[in-house]
């Protein structure tokens, strides 16, 4: 209920071989949530997003699955709140794609495996309104945005380096997409 204390959150890793559980020491955090947990492409590294109660300060942690030690690879702060999404995508080299409103608009960013910004993939005074995914074979990102006007949502592809942007939707209005698993085909829903 609003105003009541949050549940106490803890994070543990269970090793199937040794049958031992390791607790991740999150003692530096108080009154927090863990809204997302996801394995990276490194089999021994777990990612966890730790968010303060006010939901305006988020740390992305990389946790060593063997030792339960962690490092903060990314921090997001906002005066109002940090939007939680399921857009975190790990690439083969364990670099990752992340969406953020840190420049005032929701855009797509590429970070290396240590959390160092490689490049801002999308840029402009408009928002990415949906992140559809990453085509590893062709190094392309697929997304929806309002870059053609606030009442128009179009579907795009763009290279990981931020070049070769291509509008995929043909009609003006609201376009949504559902992509095939290999990103070779998509269904365009238009209204």
Residue ranges and their predicted role:
Residues 1-191:
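Beta-propeller folds
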